[in-house]
């Protein structure tokens, strides 16, 4: 299995590159992610607290074990490694069986245009607690790496998880050539919205800023140029006739409260993919 992770939320903090989505994928795959779904389970925050007492308030709350990864990654980058190289080295340290790839080696931070001005997505999420009204989500295009291109060329199917379509998946789709390659693959996505309610995060605000309905239909429309199948929660009221032509509708329990629910959803995805092969 290969996972292509969003790097649009990457941010330099206290001299180190923090890659929230990329690291969450690594920590989750390694079985050490915290119950908050970010950072490392059991981590401590004395360095973060000490920096704050010195007047250096960091944009994110970073634990000691998590910070060690950021320091190590940043040192590799300063010595000439690419983000892909650094990610491979970090993944190897956890002995991961899955291949984790950043969507690009370029630094392409996502910014949010709001009534408080344009800001990095982490400032919108953490500093402003998602409160400002949103008029635009800006995802800068990055260059596709050879590793990502090869992974996509060698696969038959692509699964898009139930992440925020605009700010988590959108930056990946904005990588040069990504949407074109996906048109030649079987692509299945899991909707992160039930009825008109996002499962978590500011997906609603971000979709509205793109003129999309806050619904599974809006998700399908955003992916419509390459999507073959959409999994929605069994409580959703969308029907097959609502979807754009060429997209098949499936239903499942899409809320992942824990590992058992996650496994059940993964099993359903594998079943659908097996039926398509």
Residue map of PLM features:
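Short acidic, glycine-rich surface-loop motifs adjacent to enzyme active sites
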Residues: 155-166
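Short gly/pro/ser/thr-enriched loop/turn and capping motifs at secondary-structure boundaries
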Residues: 8-13, 194-198, 256-258
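Short internal beta-strands
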Residues: 2-6, 186-193, 229-234
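A short, well-structured juxtamembrane/interface segment
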Residues: 85, 140-154
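Electropositive, gly/pro-rich neighborhoods at or near active sites that engage anionic ligands
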Residues: 6-141
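Active-site glycine- and acidic-residue-rich loops that bind
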Residues: 139-141, 164-175
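Redox- and metal-dependent alpha/beta enzyme cores, enriched for Fe-S-associated oxidoreductases
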Residues: 170-210
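C-terminal functional extensions of proteins
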Residues: 200-277
